């Protein structure tokens, strides 16, 4: 919710609440705080029965004062959200071992991020601690197993199924090595994200005018166009009647995972929200559809 008319955004939030959707996730970086401002306006302090989560992403300039940067980011987020606390506060950085912008190593998270998060929890500003699981898979596994986090946002979709199932070594996307199961075995709540692969699973290369103008490839190691081309390989399942559209197929694929407790879907309009809810209400895909999907995914391997 970074673009569009305020009245339309308010209607989308109201519709979501009226229809049993109770998890609202945002981040300081979404629209440079605009998403938080819009969500705060729509909620107007009324969080009865819902979970609000936000995230902090540290830049290289923040690394000299990680604890202070985290605290300042959360305080600014709470001001924009018009709240005195959030249910879940999440780290929004890539884990790795380079000096790339926005990348943290495992030791920085353990030694500096987690203590800062714990202090904010003790102060009553957050209830639960989480992180976005992107980056080095070994580090992500260690992080969900470290005992300090309550939740992890995990990439999982038709193009990137590895968080939920074993894929070949040469599968052309990140291999998260069944991170969903690892998280749940460690007592960490798994939240499925990037369900539509940043929009690629719409099958349309043209970005929605209210969405992000561009995204990095999620389902391939090449570019967004390649992601879209791979997404179109699932169109025969639509033609065969397994789902009414590619987005519906993508959403129902994710909720077909029997152990994934929560799925998060990014939306730009009320219409997209209603379509996503309708897809969820249709339930998991049939076993035959899932078998056809596995065959298509296997063909992605070079």
PLM region spans:
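Beta/alpha (TIM)-barrel catalytic core signal, keyed to glycine-rich beta->alpha loops juxtaposed to Asp/Glu
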Residues: 94-301
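Alpha-helix-loop-beta-strand connector modules within alpha/beta enzyme cores
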Residues: 36-54, 110-123
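Active-site mouth loops of central-metabolism enzymes
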Residues: 1-7, 56-68
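A structural motif
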Residues: 18-21, 83-86, 126, 149, ...
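Acidic (Asp/Glu)-rich catalytic clusters
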Residues: 17-18, 40-48, 78-83, 144-147, ...
């Amino acid at each position: 919710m970074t673009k569009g008319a305020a009245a339309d955004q308010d209607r989308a939030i109201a519709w979501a609440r009226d229809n049993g959707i109770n998890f609202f996730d945002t981040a300081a970086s979404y629209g440079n705080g605009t998403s938080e401002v819009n969500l705060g306006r729509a909620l107007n302090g009324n969080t009865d029965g819902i979970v609000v989560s936000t995230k902090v992403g540290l830049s290289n300039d923040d690394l000299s004062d990680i604890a202070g940067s985290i605290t300042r980011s959360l305080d600014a987020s709470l001001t924009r959200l018009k709240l005195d606390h959030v249910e879940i506060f999440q780290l929004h950085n890539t884990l790795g071992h380079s000096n790339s912008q926005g990348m943290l190593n495992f030791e920085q998270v353990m030694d500096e991020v987690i203590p800062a998060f714990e202090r904010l929890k003790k102060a009553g500003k957050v209830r639960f601690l989480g992180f976005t699981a992107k980056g080095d898979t070994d580090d992500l596994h260690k992080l969900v197993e470290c005992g300090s986090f309550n939740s992890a946002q995990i990439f999982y979709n038709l193009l990137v199924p590895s968080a939920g199932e074993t894929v070949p070594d040469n599968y052309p996307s990140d291999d998260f090595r069944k991170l969903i199961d690892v998280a749940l075995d460690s007592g960490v709540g798994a939240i499925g994200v990037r369900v539509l692969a940043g929009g690629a699973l719409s099958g349309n290369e043209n970005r929605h005018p209210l969405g992000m103008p561009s995204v990095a490839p999620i389902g391939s190691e090449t570019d967004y166009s390649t992601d879209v081309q791979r997404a179109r390989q699932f169109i025969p399942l639509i033609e065969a009647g397994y789902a009414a559209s590619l987005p519906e197929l993508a959403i129902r694929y994710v909720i077909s995972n029997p152990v994934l407790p929560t799925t998060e879907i990014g939306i730009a309009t009320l219409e997209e929200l209603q379509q996503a809810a309708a897809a969820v209400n249709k339930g998991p895909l049939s076993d035959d559809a899932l078998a056809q999907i596995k065959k298509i995914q296997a063909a992605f391997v070079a």
